[in-house]
Each structure stands twice: as structure tokens, then as C-alpha cells.
Amino acid sequence: MNRCRALVAQQARAFAEQGYLCTLVDFFGTGDCDGDLVDATLAQWRDNLERTIETLLAEQDLPLVLWGLRLGALIALDYAAQSDRTVRDIVLWQPVTSGKIYINQVLRQRVASLMVRDLPPETTKEIRQRLADGEHVEIAGYTLAGALAADIEAIDTSRFTGLCSGTLHWLEHVVEEGKDIGIPSRKLVDQLGESHTVNVQTFNDPPIWQIHERDEAPQLLALSRELLA
């Protein structure tokens, strides 16, 4: 996600120009935050969010808007589902729809990396067992422990009700203009739509979260600015 930081910072500045107090959260063990990822838990990350929100609301009592990218989007939804705070809107960029699927994708990165480096192969099942046994696993330069992986996999999207009083904005990448969002996304959007106002928008900028080169996403930025104008 490091390659997304410049894009996220650019959008944060745009939100600030629109009058929002905007803070980017580095969760425990990530970015510039203290601690190591191997010691992180989802409970700590929820606490990071809560403390950040407390600080912002102490500065100025404004409506609360949550914004997240990929796993951060799923964590924002999870926080809103558990918090007693009133959230007005939630902005989701290319949201992860399942913690279990996300962890599977992360583990596959290790499988692919071992293959490319001609190292002894592992399967996702074997990596899961290592994590369950208390081992730490290196993936893409980060060290993952079983506790955080289990926490993320256990996020229960069926509890995602009463998340916000306003609109849940779902922004998702499509290969071609006019295409619908993916099937897993559509299922979760339909579920959320039973109890929320959901605004689905698509964009076809480069998928910055998965490409190696730094790039721009002008369509995504423009859509996001319009949402909270």
C-alpha cells in the first residue's frame, strides 16, 4: 500500500480544502506509527481510529466521515458497526469485501514470491498452519503474525447495519467504462443497501494499489471531491 500513500495524501489535502479536518491514520505497526506489525491486533487498530476521532472532534465538532482504501475500507465499516459514534458518511475506495479473501490474497503473495526467488515452495494451507502454530511469516517485506490475520478473517460483514446516517459511497475500479462492479462487491452492496443509502461509482484509472509503478488516478480524485462538496 506504500504506492498509494501519495494518492491518499493528495485526496486528504483536497478534503481539507473543502473544509474538512482530515487525518490519515497509520495503524499500529504500519507507516510512521510506533510498534511492529507482528504485534498488531485489530483491537489496537480500532483504538487507533477511536483516538484519532476523539482528537479531531475535540478540535472542532463537525459531522464524522470515515474514508478508507482496500483493507482500510473494510476496517472503517467494521469500526462503524461497533462504535456508538454517529457517522454521517463513509467513503470507500476499492473496498475489500471479505477479511478471509483478503488474507488469502496476502498469503498468495508469499507463495508467488517464493516461486519467483526459486525458494522452497509453500501452499496457503501450510502458511496458515504456520501462523496458527504461532510462527511469524514474512510477506512483501512485512512480518505477519497469526493474531492479526485471524482478527481480519473474523470480520463479520453480516453485522454491517446502522453504519452511517447519511450515504455510504462505494468507489470501485472497472476495466472498462460502463462495466458493473465485481460480483462479491455487488453482493455486499446489495446487503448494505437494505439498511443504508449506498452510492456506487466506478472509475477506470490505473489500479494503483496493485501496480508497481507510481501513477495517477484523476478520475477517482475528482469523484471523491464531488461526494463531499
Regions found by a protein language model. Give the residues of each.
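Catalytic nucleophile-loop/oxyanion-hole region of alpha/beta-hydrolase
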Residues: 30-61
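The alpha/beta-hydrolase serine catalytic core
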Residues: 86-225
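Short beta-to-alpha linker loops that shape the active-site pocket of alpha/beta-hydrolase fold enzymes
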Residues: 21, 26-31, 96, 204-206
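Terminal, non-globular segments
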Residues: 13-16, 23-25, 188-191, 221, ...
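Active-site signature of alpha/beta-hydrolase-fold catalytic machinery across serine-
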Residues: 78-82
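Short, surface-exposed "cap/lid" segments of acyl-processing enzymes
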Residues: 1-27
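Alpha/beta-hydrolase fold nucleophile elbow
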Residues: 57-71
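Gly/Ala-rich beta-loop-alpha elbow adjacent to hydrolase catalytic centers
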Residues: 67-76, 94
